[in-house]
């Protein structure tokens, strides 16, 4: 009986912890929200946030694919020009 009670309590704690945790934070390393912002300075468009996995090389590559001549991470965002 004590083992069953312990399993039920453990199960409820896991469910409660899972429901209270912020699932967006856990999945944020694989999900990128692309918001295009028109810049009025030297760069034409700044969009995807730069992270450890999405750095200068990836930014440059994506900008070239979108027919810009250059791209770099500036202030934490991928900026194409």
From Swiss-Prot:
Its main location: secreted. Keywords: Antimicrobial, Disulfide bond, Fungicide, Plant defense, Secreted, Signal. Residues 1-23 form the signal peptide. The keyword Signal applies. Disulfide bonds join 46-80, 50-73, 59-78, 63-79. InterPro entries: Defensin-like_dom. One of its GO terms (cellular component) is extracellular region. The keyword Disulfide bond applies. GO terms for biological process: defense response to fungus; killing of cells of another organism. It is found in: Secreted. It comes from the Eukaryota. It holds the Pfam family Defensin. Belongs to the DEFL family. This is Putative defensin-like protein 56. It comes from Arabidopsis thaliana.
